[in-house]
Each structure stands twice: as structure tokens, then as C-alpha cells.
């Protein structure tokens, strides 16, 4: 799997890195790993939460069995742990923050989740061998690196031919509401966010680490960029990745009245990138819907 021998510390494969941006991001997450677990979380609760989430449930179904999956920017490995439960897949949880991975590793050990490997390192280092993973997941991470496009190109080197890559990025238009809240947060403080941030309203008020982790990630991150649908489509074209679908869908006018849960299911079904006008409209509509209220993240699925 690796091009070089790692140090193994507390069941985590550790590679040293010196990149300044990576070091800055690592330091940012050190005290408040993201996403953090609820106090009561265990194997059963992670499965329950994952199965209740249309995106994660259908992602797991789409992946199937007997696959090698790399999650880049795994954080505390909630998704990696969920994807590893109840199948014979091999999951690699990859992040630059050792403290975050340690939380995920301890959770896996405590709950006897054995088909998961934890790797600490920088995406720009030559850590993994090429063409070894069936799925590469990079949801909400590439826009926190020093170069979104270069990090994407690096990640697909590790993807097998006919493998799938799922990329999630902040949207230039769809993130407007979060950016607006960010400015008000600087003036009004945390209490304002507890009332007006829809994600924080859902979190148990006693789960302070989880609350603090969300606030830091969404409103105080030192390295952050936003992108458009067309930027990702151009990146897919440049790297010879076939477009499968997106969420929200590029095909604004082809919406058959399905709710957002149904639209998330369609992320894993072959669609069309539509035309420029439809793509712009879809991104504008994000502002007024759930994706726009919860951070403005959009997803693109591609095939190598």
C-alpha cells in the first residue's frame, strides 16, 4: 500500500510532513478534532446515524462489498468507521491530524471494527502506491489544502481504472449564508450561532466538543476556498474523469419534483452535466435550500 515505511504509533501509520499549509491546518484541528463524536456514541449509534442519513446510507450501498476505499480528510473517522461496519471492505482513513485519527482509532478498537487502517500524513507527499483503491472519498477537505486542483490530481493517482472518486467542496454561491453568519459571529459571538446555525440547533447542548468543533470548522478555519460546478467539470475533463452526477443536481429543469433525499439517491445514478445556465441556477437555488443553510457544500461523483 505504501511507498515508504511509516512509523506506527498507537495503531496509526504516521508519515512526517513539513508543508506550512498542512502544518497550519493540523494545528487548527489539534484541540477540536472534527467532526467530534457525541458522548453516547458507540457502534450501534454510528450505524443508526449512518443509515438515517440518505447520503451515507446510499454511499455504502453503492460501494458494495470487497472494495478498497480511501477517505481523504477522514478527521475523527466517523464515516470510515461506518463504512467499515458489516462488510468485507478495506477502509483507509487518511488525515493530517494525528489527534483526530487517534479518536477514530480508539473508537474502532473499542467497538472491534477491524477492517480499517489509519494513516496520518499530507496528501501532497508520495505516501500511497498508484492505482490501488476502488473508491476515493474527498468530501469537504480539498478546499482546506494549499491547492484544490493539485490535491485532486494527486488523489486520483491512487484510484484504480474504473474506480470512483467523490469530491465535496464549498460552493462560491451556495455558501453565501454561512459567510454572512461568519461576519455576524465576529460581532455577536457564539450565542448568535447557537440560535441561527441549523446544524448547531440539532446538536445536544451538552456535547460541547462537538459544538466547538463545528464552529471552528465552519467559521474560523485559516485555510478555506470555494468553487463552482464548472471548475469541477473542467477539472474532471482535464484529468479524464467521467462525470456521473452531482448534488445538488446540475440538471435543474429535469427535477421531477423529488425531495432532497431522493435527489441524494440520484447522486449515484448516471446523469448529465446540463448546460451553463442550469448549473448556475442550481447553485443559486442552493442558497435557499438545505445545502446552503448547512455550509454550502456540493458533491460531484466521477469515474476514472
Across the structure, where does each feature detected by a protein language model lie?
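A short glycine-rich, Lys/Arg-flanked "PGG" loop and its adjoining helix->strand segment in the class I
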Residues: 149-161
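Conserved SAM-binding strand-loop segment of SAM-dependent methyltransferases
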Residues: 112-124
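Conserved class I S-adenosyl-L-methionine
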Residues: 164-199
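A short acidic, Gly/Pro-enriched loop at the edge of an enzyme's catalytic core
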Residues: 125-135
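Conserved SAM/SAH-binding beta-strand->alpha-helix loop
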Residues: 97
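Conserved alpha-helix/loop element of class I SAM-dependent methyltransferases that forms part
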Residues: 41-65
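Rossmann-like AdoMet/SAM-dependent catalytic core
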Residues: 210-303
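Conserved SAM-binding loop of SAM-dependent methyltransferases across substrates and taxa
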Residues: 76-87
